[in-house]
Amino acid sequence: MKITPVKALTDNYIWMIQHGNHAVCVDPSEPSPVLEFLVRNRLMLAQTWVTHPHPDHEGGAAALWRGYMESPVYGESDIEAATHTVTAGTQFTFGDGQVTVWATPGHTDRHTSYLLETSDGIHVFCGDTLFSAGCGRVFTGTIEQLYDSFQRFNRLPENTLFYPAHEYTAANLRFAAHIEPDNADIQTALKAAAHTPTLPVTLAHERRVNPFLRVDLPHVRDRAEALSGKTLNSSLDTFVALRELKNQYRTK
C-alpha cells in the first residue's frame, strides 16, 4: 500500500492510496490532478472517499465518477456525488486493508473520517477535523463536537498516522509557538515545516506540538487564560479558548 499527496487548488492535498494497479482518492477538490496521477502511474480508480460537503473536498467527485462509473463514491448522505452512503461504523475494504468510518463532526455538523487499518498500522484520513498542530474552524458543527472528535482521535495508538486535507502546518506551528514559546518540539517542527509536504503526521508527534491535544496540561491552560482573559475551568474551556485565540491570531 502506497499513499501519496497530490497537490490541488491553493493548499489542498488529495490523498491517493495505491494497491497494485488500483487507487483510492480522498477528498478530490478537482478532477484533473487525480486523472493526471492515474494516467502517469497507470492506475485505475477503484474508490473515492469524501469527508464532508465543502467544494474543496467534493468538487471533483462527480466528474471522477462519470469517468469511472464502476468506481463507488463513499460519503454521507449530504455528499451529492455519493453512490455509497456511509454512516458512523460503516466498514468496507480496499486491497488488504479494512476501512472503518468514524463520525468526527465539529468543522461541519456531519464530517467523516476514514480509518484504514493495514498490516503496518492505522491511517486516518481526517479531512478538516485535525490539522498538524491545529484543528479545523467551526462552520456548521459545534466546538463541543470538535473537542469530542479530538478526544476520540487521542485514544488511538500513538503510531497512528493522520492525513489532513490541507497544508496548514507552518501557520499552525507559529500559533502553537505563541501558546508554548518554550516548547522545543514546536521549534524543531517549525524548522522542518519549511520543507513541504509535512504530512502525514503521527499521533505521537501531534501530542507534542498540537495545542488542541494538549489542553489537559496546566501550563497550556494558564497561557490560554492569560491570553483570553477568561477563567478556564476544564479542558473543554481551554479548547474553546484556544480556537477563539487562533481565529484572532495574526502572524507578526
Swiss-Prot record:
Pathway(s) it belongs to: Secondary metabolite metabolism; methylglyoxal degradation; (R)-lactate from methylglyoxal: step 2/2
EC numbers, comma separated: 3.1.2.6
UniProt family annotation: Belongs to the metallo-beta-lactamase superfamily. Glyoxalase II family.
Entry-linked HAMAP family: Glyoxalase_2
Keywords: Hydrolase, Metal-binding, Zinc
Residues at which Zn(2+) 1 binds: 52, 54, 107, 128
Function: Thiolesterase that catalyzes the hydrolysis of S-D-lactoyl-glutathione to form glutathione and D-lactic acid.
Gene behind this protein: gloB
Cofactor(s) it depends on: Zn(2+)
Protein name according to UniProt: Hydroxyacylglutathione hydrolase
Native source species: Neisseria meningitidis serogroup B (strain ATCC BAA-335 / MC58)
Pfam annotation, one family: HAGH_C
